[in-house]
Amino acid sequence: MKTRVTELLGIRYPIVQGGMQWVGRAELASAVSNAGGLGTLTGLTQPSPEALVSEIERCNSMTDAPFAVNMTIFPSITPPPYEAYIDAIVGSGVKIVETAGNKAIDFWPKLKAAGISIIHKCVAVRHALTAERLGVDIVSIDGFECAGHPGEEDIPGLVLIPLAARALKVPVIASGGIADGRGMAAALSLGAEGVNMGTRFQVTREAPVHAEIKQALVRANERDTRLIFRTLRNTARVFRNAISEEVVASEKLGCQFEDIRHLVAGARGRKALESGDTNEGIISAGMVIGLIDDVPTCQELLERMVRECREHLARAQSYCQ
């Protein structure tokens, strides 16, 4: 397939594995890239910039294809050493970086000076226009269906994708609610030139996630997500389990972050992914879990998606004859 996204990134298919905390490691990123998509290492999954350098080296040993590093950068009372992580990425020769967060802008000049292509994740067209004006190469637009942080305006992809495609000159990648070739065909028809998937790649054989977590997501339906942190205006879409239900109940009663910190700690979420206990912690998941019913290899997934995409685009075209 050929779009501006495949041309800019040097990949065979316009399919991107989004950054996922604890999941975006070398075994998954390399498998996606080897299958013709763009794999992504999650920078802050690594405990230090030095560990990130080692993970980049490990990924390089597993694929000759391009891959990206994700850096999610938000204001924080005790932020990680973002500058050192960025320096590690630049020094390792990575050529593609996916950024997210309103403080990512501070690091774009350094990335651009190093010849790095920037994909920036946005949940609103006005933010995407600012990112375009400041020089990002590609915008990844997240609809309300997505896992992680969909923003506070609840605009679904069916509206957000064409709005972004109409407003922007840079290529748009559609993110949120996509798991198969049907969704990919829809995204391309709406004006996107690529798709981004997180939850779908979490449920592949190569994903470094316990098999029971993968099977729980396979068994789930589209109603099995919850929105947490709504009252804190930092909304996140996560898998419905005992922990997320307790968080939602606490928010309904009125709570501060400190009241639920012990429930949502990142270490608990990581333990859940590694142990297979679905009720151990918060597990990120999008509404797309309703469309996931198997655990393929990344190669099988991408080849199937591209085949289905072509079939659905051809079928839609036949209606116009």
Describe these PLM feature segments.
Residues M1-A167:
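Active-site entrance/lid segments in N-terminal catalytic domains of soluble metabolic enzymes
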Residues I73, E145, G177-I178, R200:
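Acidic, glycine-rich active-site loops and adjacent beta-strand->loop/helix elements
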Residues G151-I173, A179-Q321:
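Conserved active-site-proximal phosphate/metal-binding subdomains
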